[in-house]
Amino acid sequence: MEFTTIVVILLVIACIVVLFFIGSSISLWVQSLVSGARVGLLNIVFMRFRKVPPKLIVTSKIMAVKSGLEISTDDFESHYLAGGDVSRVVKALIAADKANIDLPFNRAAAIDLAGRNVLEAVQMSVNPKVIETPLIAAMAKDGIQLKAISRVTVRANIDRLVGGAGEETILARVGEGIVTTIGSANSHKMVLENPDLISKTVLSKGLDSGTAYEILSIDIADVDVGKNIGAELETDRAEADKKIAQAKAEERRAMAYAMEQEMKARVQEMRAKVVEAEAQVPLAMAEAFRQGNLGIMDYYRMKNIVSDTDMRQSIATPEKDDPDQP
């Protein structure tokens, strides 16, 4: 009796465990069976052990079958285990099939694993996207600055989504083309009169090579006149030349002042030499007296000459007014 009770308890526990693992899988199996997806019950059960969500795989399989796509369950599982978005890939395949775009599962999975939004790429292939460039400033040959904004219509190229450049490259190339076109114009009026000249020139350069997009059109949304860069450059150059000339003039003035001071110093030096020479005269006269080369009459005659010279100088020089006299 006790043995029978133990067996019954074990059977009940076994049934509970089986229902725990199979119970939720049965509903998914029935759902797939009714939808014609044909996902095996054991396959659904063992998905849990493979760390794969059964509901996601079964739902994706049903969506693919209902849309007429033949994709195996193993492909869904392998893509999920690789880190891909199974639901987005299935939706992209369905959208591509409805739009008559050749997109195999392997290519869609590769695009998804590369980090691209494959569903958005398919939608952009059907409905092109408009990208607006930021404000681009460039200067024409006459020195006038022009500011332009353009709208680029692009369509996704599914064949180049893996390894192709993104929107940033398109914007950079278009901006470079606009700057080159405006810079090569002889006058800013030429660009203002023919804005389509920019779009035609830029579009003819094949800017979409090596990118994941195909440029359909480039439209100039707005062109504004900016600063007169040429005049500003000339003004700055004139101001710089003025400062250089002022610096050179200041240098010449400093040199002239230094030379003037040097000449004054030389004059003082010459005067000092004269005074020194005059101081040697009495010594020379005394030596002449001792040697007998100069007599007393000669000495007085020389004194008379000096006195006459001083008198003539005093007569020739006008007297200065004495400020102390009333």
Curated annotation (Swiss-Prot):
Its main location: membrane. The chain crosses the membrane at residues 3-23. InterPro entries: FloA (IPR022853). It comes from the Bacteria. It is found in: Cell membrane; Membrane raft. Keywords: Cell membrane, Membrane, Transmembrane, Transmembrane helix. One of its GO terms (cellular component) is plasma membrane. Pfam families: FloA (PF12127). The keyword Ubl conjugation does not apply. It is a single-pass membrane protein. Found in functional membrane microdomains (FMM) that may be equivalent to eukaryotic membrane rafts. FMMs are highly dynamic and increase in number as cells age. Flotillins are thought to be important factors in membrane fluidity. Belongs to the flotillin-like FloA family. Homooligomerizes. This is Flotillin-like protein FloA.
